[in-house]
Amino acid sequence: MEKKKIVLKNFTEDELKEFMKTIDEKPFRGSQIFSWIYKGAKTFDDMNNIPKSLRNKLEEVSCIGHIDIELKLESKVDNTKKYLFLLDDGNIIETVMMDYDSRVTVCVSNQVGCRMGCNFCASTMDGLIRNLEPWEILDQVIKIQEDTGKRVSNLVLMGSGEPLDNFENTKQFLKIINEKNGLNIGYRHITLSTCGIVPKMYELADLEIAINLALSLHSPYDEERRKIMPVANAYSIEEILNACRYYIKKTNRRVTFEYSLIKGVNDSEKEAKALAKLLKGMLCHVNLIPINKVEEREYEKPDKAFIYKFRDSLEKNNIPATVRMSMGSDISGACGQLRRKYK
């Protein structure tokens, strides 16, 4: 069996310098190669200040790492683009770019599929196929920057997959994306969304890297949450909120609670008041997301009046809340609509 090659995009700059030592090369070559990677080098022969002997050696044991754009869809109603990327093993992942006036945000996937089973989300329908490696998450951002010529300023880990279910690779990706000689995206411009894997939430907090944490809550009641989110069978709302409080304490960052509003399921005045009571005193914000249509599901978004009544009820009880503007829904690129194949 052919030995699997080492993917250089999986390394930080310091790690690449260490890798040079393992192949009997000077560490400074690692910095040169790192620079070439982020200048867009596609092959080792593009690196014209690297000796031919080293390029040949690298060719034998390693590769740079590339995913390919299979398809790009552009929204007709807003500045959203959805990319379908083809991975080396033939799997497909989806990534969304949102071009705002003041920033460019990319929503990356971190798994092929998802095993969390949230029953309003398209990403989980085929289950989990595999985790993405750090470089495969990273290259979504690189390829979008190359395609558009625009610098990505903000990043959300809200595509297919649960980041904390792929924790080690997510953690390494966060180190790489922050590299000053790489893409240099600051931690305060990165948001990680989780459905609440409590032990990993504590581990994330202990990293003390101060990224923004978004918690998919969707109901103030354990019983109701278990019906729409199977992960709720493993962790109660109380356990999740305690982990959120710990995260706030360690990072001094506000936690965002994502709440998908589903008509007749979780959109009543009673639930708004229960949610406000639950979050009282926390450094937090509620992001209300009118459910986006997934053709295999019967869920519907509430009428606009109900949506804003829910928001007003939270704010009346001193819980900051906004209604998220849904972008990319006409290309199935909105929250909950990403999947591992194009339909």
UniProtKB/Swiss-Prot annotation:
Q: Radical SAM core domain spans which residues?
A: 100-330
**Catalysed reactions, semicolon-separated:** adenosine(2503) in 23S rRNA + 2 reduced [2Fe-2S]-[ferredoxin] + 2 S-adenosyl-L-methionine = 2-methyladenosine(2503) in 23S rRNA + 5'-deoxyadenosine + L-methionine + 2 oxidized [2Fe-2S]-[ferredoxin] + S-adenosyl-L-homocysteine; adenosine(37) in tRNA + 2 reduced [2Fe-2S]-[ferredoxin] + 2 S-adenosyl-L-methionine = 2-methyladenosine(37) in tRNA + 5'-deoxyadenosine + L-methionine + 2 oxidized [2Fe-2S]-[ferredoxin] + S-adenosyl-L-homocysteine
Q: Which organism is it from?
A: Clostridioides difficile (strain 630) (Peptoclostridium difficile)
Enzyme class at the top of the EC tree: transferase
Which amino acids does the record list as binding S-adenosyl-L-methionine?
161-162, 193, 216-218, 292
GO molecular function term, any single one = rRNA (adenine(2503)-C2-)-methyltransferase activity
Q: List the disulfide bonds.
A: 107-335
Q: Which gene encodes it?
A: rlmN
| Pfam families on file | Radical_SAM (PF04055), RlmN_N (PF21016)
Q: Which family does it belong to?
A: Belongs to the radical SAM superfamily. RlmN family.
Q: How is the cofactor bound?
A: Binds 1 [4Fe-4S] cluster. The cluster is coordinated with 3 cysteines and an exchangeable S-adenosyl-L-methionine.
* Keywords per UniProt: 4Fe-4S, Cytoplasm, Disulfide bond, Iron, Iron-sulfur, Metal-binding, Methyltransferase, rRNA processing, S-adenosyl-L-methionine, Transferase, tRNA processing
Q: Which residues form the active site?
A: 94, 335
Q: Which GO terms describe its cellular component?
A: cytoplasm
- In Swiss-Prot or TrEMBL terms, this protein is called Probable dual-specificity RNA methyltransferase RlmN
Q: Where in the cell is it found?
A: Cytoplasm
- Which InterPro entries is this protein grouped with? Aldolase_TIM (IPR013785), Elp3/MiaA/NifB-like_rSAM (IPR006638), Methyltransferase_A (IPR040072), RlmN_N (IPR048641), RNA_MTrfase_RlmN (IPR027492), rRNA_lsu_MTrfase_RlmN/Cfr (IPR004383), rSAM (IPR007197)
Print the miscellaneous field. Reaction proceeds by a ping-pong mechanism involving intermediate methylation of a conserved cysteine residue.
Region forming the signal peptide:
none
Binding locations of [4Fe-4S] cluster:
114, 118, 121
Q: What is its EC number?
A: 2.1.1.192
A single GO BP: rRNA base methylation
Per its database record, what is this protein's job? Specifically methylates position 2 of adenine 2503 in 23S rRNA and position 2 of adenine 37 in tRNAs.
Q: Which cofactor does it need?
A: [4Fe-4S] cluster
Q: What PROSITE patterns does its record include?
A: RADICAL_SAM (PS51918)
Read off the lineage from the record. Answer: Bacteria, Bacillati, Bacillota, Clostridia, Peptostreptococcales
